[in-house]
Regions:
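Histidine-centered divalent metal-coordination motifs
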Residues: 47-50, 90
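A short, N-terminal "cap"/entry segment at the start of jelly-roll beta-barrel domains
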Residues: 1-34, 39-47, 113-118
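A short hydrophobic beta-strand segment most commonly corresponding to one strand
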Residues: 32, 95-113
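Short, surface-exposed secondary-structure boundary micro-motifs
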Residues: 87-88, 93
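Short acidic-glycine-tyrosine-enriched beta hairpin
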Residues: 70-87
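Short, conserved beta-strand element in jelly-roll/cupin
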Residues: 37-40, 49-67
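Short, surface-exposed beta-strand-loop junctions and turns on beta-sheet-rich folds
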Residues: 55, 71-73, 98-99, 107
């Protein structure tokens, strides 16, 4: 199956400084994996997900990630990957275009929002 990104509807989430496209998702494709294209221009909530492992791939731009309580804040840029094991709190900010992949697939409501650390 070929999925043309320009045929996937964009969703604006201005309260989160994000625009996204849910390219591969459990409702239409597979419960095993989800892939979302995202452009962010600000801060992403501190969250934890007990259901899935998550990988971020930064396509372009730059930002900062904190993965784990008390972990160092690390810079990321185009070409970098960030792995988030399930059950690990994290947050990030920046001006980036990235892909986020979840295994198993992301389910709405599965992220628990935590108090901000960055």
């Amino acid at each position: 199956m070929v999925i043309h990104s320009d045929e996937v509807p964009q969703e604006a989430q201005p309260e989160r400084s994000m625009v996204l496209r849910r390219v591969i998702n459990a409702d239409r494709h597979s419960a095993a994996i989800s892939v979302t294209w995202v452009r962010i221009t600000g801060h992403h909530d501190r969250v934890v997900n007990q259901d899935c492992d998550r990988v971020y791939y930064v396509i372009e731009g730059a930002g900062r990630f904190q993965v784990g309580d008390g972990a160092p804040v690390e810079a990321v840029a185009g070409g970098d990957f960030v792995f988030i094991p399930r059950g690990t709190p994290y947050e990030f900010d920046g001006n980036m275009l990235y892909l986020v992949m979840n295994g198993p697939a992301f389910r709405a409501g599965s992220d628990a929002v935590l108090p901000r650390a960055l």
